[in-house]
Amino acid sequence: MQELTPMMQQYMEIKQRVKDCILFFRLGDFYEMFFDDAIIASKELEIALTARDCGNNEKAPMCGVPYHSAHSYIAKLIEKGYKVAICEQVEDPKLAKGVVKREITRIITPGTFIDENFSKANNFICCVARVESDFALTFVDISTGEMYACLIENDIQKMINEISKYAPSEILISHLDNELYEVIRENYNSFVQRIEFIEIDRCYDLIDKQMQITNINDKVALSVGNLLNYLVDTQKISFNYIKKFEFYRVQNYLQIDLSTKRNLELTESIIARSKKNSLFGILDQAKTSMGSRLIKKWLERPLIDVVEINRRLDAVEELYNNFPLLMQIEGLLEGIYDIERLSSKFAYKSINAKDLLSLKKSIEVLPRLKELLGEFKSPLLKELYNELDTLEDVYSLIDSSINEDAPVGLKEGGIIKDGFNDHVDRLRNISKNSKELLIQYEEKERNLTGIKNLKIGYNKVFGYYIEVTKSNYSLVPERYIRKQTLANAERYVTEELKKLEDEIINAEQKLVELEYELFCQIRDKIESQIERIQKTASCIAIIDALCSFAHIAIDNRYTKPIVYLGDRIYIKNGRHPVVEKMIGYSNFVPNDTELDNDQNRVLIITGPNMAGKSTYMRQVALIVIMAQMGCFVPAEEAQIGIVDKIFSRIGASDDISSGQSTFMVEMSEVANILKNATPKSLIIFDEVGRGTSTYDGLSIAWAVLEFVADKSKIGAKTLFATHYHELTELEEKISGVKNYRVDVKEEGKNIIFLRKIVRGGCDSSYGIHVARLAGIPEEVLQRAEQILKKLEEADINRKEAKRLRKEIKREFTEQIEFFSYKKDEIIEKIENLDILNITPIQALNILSELKHEIIKAKERQLL
């Protein structure tokens, strides 16, 4: 049996190293896939499946994609959950002895995929290291150079919440931690990799070599080190370009759990699952991708540091009050490319001349941007002015060296500007003159042969050639040497053309090689300044985010909140930032809010469905979040005492995937709130208890409300919307509980939602009115009204009967000693009463008869 061909032997050897990947094997201008990889790729990419002789008298299934368009195919495979290994030719095929040397240069996974189209959003990869009961989390976006790490102590739910903020596309965990693997799989759709963790000493070695990070403990180092080890192993590059490392403590930021983030629609809407109609969609008016990502980060992690919040607010206020300067700054920002992502391309050596020109255009506006920043006085803007590096040396290098019309490819020539390098100029002159000679030669041959459409062309296989169409074959002279036959033409060469070709090719080849060499030198010089470039990118992102906040404040009539360390939340004429944009400013009804930790701790809000209870409660939470981000808020006036956590229990939904019912999901969320809320927290409860029977639900809602209102237990600021009108009694029983309702106006059988929150409880849910608004047939509504009337009468009867029964028993007890001889008879009468099926009048008559007998008995006793 024949052995595999040498090339296929090489392929099989390399494939053994990446069994879990689809191997893109470079063959000339294509990436080829073989065997099972080819079968999978042809199906997933919808490309033709062919075959290639591989030895052993067999043909291997094969498919391929052009190397210059491979990125889009790789993206499709990554999106479908595959890993892709890139195997490149690492020596010149012309110089190779035997099979061209090839090596795996990169393994691409969901978390290490870099979008060449530069999507605005981050693409994080996360590593979770569990040490005892604690969780060390590290997040990296290799495309922007950002790295964040934190330690979650003994709280798996908090770990889940923190990971959700970054929405990582890939999560790494130890291959030994089966329990953690199940938790991750249950909560995220991310690509989960179980890897063999390296020891802590190796982690520290890697960190020292790659990052120069200090002041992290062993638990965090285990997470950081294993993530770095994975990246180095798959990307085959150094990660010392990652300069933006931040270790943070979760408790140093406003904590918002996953459920609340979803309920408040912070980053995406619940229905469309998109940025549109979310708070992020309103706040993100950034002109750069860097600013957009920073706004999202600020939204995921609002501050609790009053000083830093007010630094942002003061900067936004100054921009707000200087609209002409704001407009000029935003105009400059619009011309800035994604410098963070351009920076990462230096590490991968994938940056091209077009990228450098984009960097140059971005740097070009920096001197003017710095000049405008010098006009401001607020501390944060002055700090940004001082830190903004205009990178004039980098600009000068690119401007003097890179041709404005440079191609994307690095080995096509035309990259280096005239006048930058003498040798380039000399070779370019030869090349240009030779081309002129070719034009002259073409004209000469047309005249000699009489073939008017004769033309000279070039391809990599045959070099320069003379092409003659079929109709002119009879005019071809004998000195023409045939090289290639086409369907409608023949291609020829002459000795004179060969001589010209040698001159041109040698000059052009040397020129291409020299230009590439010079480009690499320029690239490396700029890469040596990468830390300065990244710091400038960070400054630009902050400036952009602050300008976005100022602009939306102007457009949407927001006001600067007073943020302080107290416990009071006072909002005058507050609005929901998203809803008011959807329905129009003039159509939105604003509302006041007053919450504190004393007499306004818990606001019970009643009113019909669709009246606006949920919108009102959400808007309070969103205003708090916006204020603690350092953003102006949709209100006439706002005083926000710092909140440490925001919780919400809104809506009812089954968690089918985990087998949890509506009520179980609801109670789990309530339990999480009761366990983690503090007096500094803000809690939103919407219809607690409606997922079970009326009495169970009422009992639970009542107990929950008592618990959160109790200062000795939680005492948190709480908004509690309910249809259980019985809960309004708590205003009289618990200090700090206040009743509010959404006001409505009745007009006959119809109601008008006034959307106004007013003092006092609501004694009707207006369910039938809402059903009428929803279009329920009138026949059904009339029947519903009949049933409601009977139920209400029955309820009155039950209450009255209960009251009468108590009165009868009291009367009986008082008189029993006077008619002991009649007591059995009277007790029997009472026991035989069908209380629920008698009217109040009948009950009063019976009571009168019993009373009459007792009086008679007393009289007999006294005789």
From Swiss-Prot:
Lineage: Bacteria, Bacillati, Bacillota, Bacillota incertae sedis, Caldicellulosiruptorales
SUPFAM superfamilies, alphabetized: DNA repair protein MutS, domain I, DNA repair protein MutS, domain II, DNA repair protein MutS, domain III, P-loop containing nucleoside triphosphate hydrolases
InterPro entries reported for this sequence: DNA_mismatch_repair_MutS, DNA_mismatch_repair_MutS-lik_N, DNA_mismatch_repair_MutS/MSH, DNA_mismatch_repair_MutS_C, DNA_mismatch_repair_MutS_clamp, DNA_mismatch_repair_MutS_core, DNA_mismatch_repair_MutS_N, DNA_mismatch_repair_MutS_sf
SMART domains reported in the protein's UniProt record: MUTSac, MUTSd
Molecular functions per Gene Ontology: ATP binding; ATP-dependent DNA damage sensor activity; damaged DNA binding; mismatched DNA binding
PROSITE patterns found in the cross-reference section: DNA_MISMATCH_REPAIR_2 (PS00486)
Name of the protein in question: DNA mismatch repair protein MutS
Binding residues for ATP: 607-614
Residues passing through the membrane, by range: none
Superkingdom: Bacteria
